[in-house]
Amino acid sequence: MASTSTEVFPFKDQELSTQLLFQLNILRQEQIFTDVILCTEDKEIPCHRNVLVSSSPYFRAMFCSNFRESSQARVDLKGIASEVIECVVDYIYTGSITITMELVLPLMQAASMLQYGRLFEACSTFLQEQLNPENCLSMIRLSEILHCETLKERAKEMAVRCFSDVAASEDFCELTLPELMCYLEDDRLCAEEEQVFETLLAWIHHDPFSRRGAIHDLFKKVRLRFIHPTYLFQFIANDPLVQSSTLCTEIIESVRRLMFSVSAKCTKELKPLWTTPRRYTCRETLVVVGGRKNNEQTSREALLYDERTQRWQWLAKLPLRLYKAAYVCIHSILYVVGGLSLSLVSGDSAVSATVYTLSLKTNQWRTAEPMLEPRYAHQCVSYLHFIFALGGIGQDKQISNTVERYNSMFNQWEVMAPMPTAVLHPAVAANDQRIYVFGGEDALQNPVRLIQVYHISRNLWSRLETRTVKNVCAPAAVIEDKIYIVGGYTRRVIAYDTKANKFVKCTNMKERRMHHAATVINNKLYVTGGRFLNSHDVIEDSDCFECYDPKTDVWTSKGSLPYKLFDHGSLPLICVSNRPNPP
């Protein structure tokens, strides 16, 4: 019979090393077998040479090489306070230490000198826990002296994340020019570009005699594209420091040409300033506004969707109920244009020319210059710093082909060339100096199989008949050089390639949808709400929230809206965040 006894029994005493160290510490305290004395200016600390050698490369090199200390019974440790050496020796023999604000700096220096890496990192962790916007800049300088990269990186991360508070600290104005430039060019900087400019001005004015020449280099670090044109051209362009610099005025003029001319190209020198958003500040968020919700009640709600938490946040309500207004955003400001204003009390309605604006900075609705012509059921589209209002229904209740353009720089509307054909509910998008109006319906509600193209710089229209276009009540959105037309009493999704002048079929939606909204965030198409035909061909309102990825040609559900909604606006707005965007 085979033996069942265990021939091999591996055993490891988990407590032996701890007990061994404990007993060695007792021997040290009783000065038994100690063979070396560490000397400071006012103290002598007996130790075991082999324990020191085993604990640190510094002592191993000292005692195991041909240094004179290898044969000495007494070793002087100059430049380290006695209480610090005592703490280090206690740490060597026990593995424990209490770090305080009074002790941390000399302890960190000693740990660095004596090559106790874990103790050094423990001190670094302690200092990282003390970080705040007021001391992070001094912590960065300290980390450079101590050569502590982990502390330096954490302190710099706080400096760019809490830039508003850091810029107000006393240490900020003492930064050198290279240090300030390093912060201002950081993609992680959590600040709006207006504040970036104001901060560099404050730094220069702290010592204007020696710093005013730095405006050339500092101004290049401001991402000018993300500054509102009014602030840029009325405040920044007129600042005496900016005007004193030829380079700054040349940059301002280049930006002016880019904003005012639809055909201007971005120069190589200006491109970093113009095209690159910061990872922290340029987080696009989805805003859903207006429309008709549950039981066709006109809604005053404005909602913001947080992709990270996947939750909806309520913004300030519209000042009044508007039926079939147009919605557009430009320079991170939401515009609600025109519409049919409704009174729930009297039941009266009036065609409106009013323009309301909402900024996420203030979360308050304001009025801008009203349109020249009241209209509703119209379309609005933005291009550069312009907003175009196209068609709709006017005060005479007739379908209009008129077009007007709003200049956000000067808060002015002007009449533009009318559309060749008046249509209702077309899909409209702007790309590459042109506005495209796809389909829609005529006064008799017949689909119009037509593409109308407006050349912005020439103020001229052209038209192209095509049987591919048959959309009504469908939104359009631009991703790269393709205009996506989504649904419109159909499940169909098609992409119009503006360069190749051809249509490409995409994956269909799940339902035949109309009166929905679509927008683009991070090169993905987000579709919200609308109405759809169910399996019994009955029209129902929808709270659907879906996303289309053109790279994979796949639709995914993002959940649902807080309520069923159609004839609303769906727009991307940029909000400031102190968390980075995912790579």
Curated annotation (Swiss-Prot):
Segments annotated as Kelch repeats: 285-332, 333-385, 386-433, 435-481, 482-523, 525-575
Molecular function terms from GO: ubiquitin-like ligase-substrate adaptor activity
Xref: Gene3D superfamilies: 1.25.40.420, Kelch-type beta propeller, Potassium Channel Kv1.1, Chain A
Keyword Plastid attached: no
Domain BACK span(s) in chain numbering: 136-237
Ranges where the BTB domain occurs: 34-101
CDD domains: BACK_KLHL38 (cd18476), BTB_POZ_KLHL38 (cd18268)
SUPFAM superfamilies attached to this UniProt entry: Kelch motif (SSF117281), POZ domain (SSF54695)
GO cellular component: Cul3-RING ubiquitin ligase complex; cytoplasm
Domain of life, per lineage: Eukaryota
Protein keywords: Kelch repeat, Repeat
PROSITE patterns registered for this protein in UniProt: BTB
Identification of the protein by name: Kelch-like protein 38
